Amino acid sequence: MKALSRLLPAALAIACLASPAALAASFDCSKASTLVETAVCTAPTLSVKDEQLSALYQPLQHQKVFRELQRRWLREVRNLCKSAICLENAYDQQIERLTPAQPNPQAEAPTLRPSSDQQPYLQITDAPWQRFALATVPGVNPHLYTQVVDVAILDGVLNVVVFVGEHVDQTVRNAGNSYEKRYFGSLYEYSDARSGLHPIVRDIRFSGWNNIGANDQGERYAGIIDGVFYYRHRVKGEAEQSMAYTLGSKEQPQPSTQLFSAESGAKRFSKAMIATDLNYDNTNVMLHYPYERDGNTYDRVMDKNDNGWSVVNPMWNQTRPVLYFDNSGDFACVWRVDLVNKTLEKIVPEHEAVSAVPVDVLGQEALVYLEGDKLMFTIAPQQ
């Protein structure tokens, strides 16, 4: 292939010809207006890659996540290229990003063992995860209790349920237990195929977790199963009612005899045991491997001399040996604990980031979280 440095000056002197290679690009080459577009039209291999990428993107473009990923790729990667090799690599990168990852049933799960030297995990503070806002959460201020309740992919589309607690229900609060409380508030749904958040129900006494507001909020009582969001709310005194809402239906939630119940974030999908109760000591994370019989059975994730940790909202990835948590101490942001590579990565640096929940998008690792009044999305860098 010609080097782009030789290709681009030629593109300035002659119009893009309507050759078979040119017509293979995903856009009208007769209207190519930039040097990069002209280069794509003129180079046969780039035209093929552009067409391949377009075929992947077209069925996804109704979803905000993919529109934003494509926009950023164009602005920050492709359109900055100055060589043919750069363009080739840029297209390969985005084609890989938009290609659904195929599960490999033959792949063996990695063997998880504690570090032999008992050293803290390698700390990485500049992990290059892309992140951007999905929607604005209505009625949020710093004094409100706001949480991502659950996340699911339905028919290929990201769906999120958010709770905004507006004030504490004083009628059932146990003064002797700061976590024995409920909030009056509203539930909202987000679908990546339509803009904004939409109310599911307003002004309910929401019972989403056993220890609402705790570092580890305990057993979960609200979540998505097969496209239906189940939750509980207090109707009178200590009486609770289970409700069901079909995501995207815009209909009123209906009473349900089916209950949602799941383990706490510290335990659900766990690949090792968090050795301490984070509601009593959340200044570090120790991971215990109970099946290890010889030698050390613990991993120390943080340096014991670091004083900036206040670990909240632990959440395990369902399929990967990865733990996430928010940190409300001096190291505030969202962190990722990789049990295979023994790394502790800061993946969201903003101090306001909270309530991170993992999700796979096209088989790729991603998170949904809250930052102020914004519902946010972040996705892992490509390997």
How should each PLM-predicted stretch be described?
Residues M1-A11:
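Bacterial N-terminal signal peptides that target proteins for export
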Residues A11-L12, T343:
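Short loop/turn motifs at secondary-structure junctions
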Residues S19-A21:
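N-terminal signal peptide c-region/cleavage motif recognized by signal peptidases
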Residues L23-S116, Q170-S178, A239, M376-A380:
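N-terminal alpha-helical modules
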Residues A107-Q383:
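Sequence signature of WD/YWTD-type beta-propeller architectures
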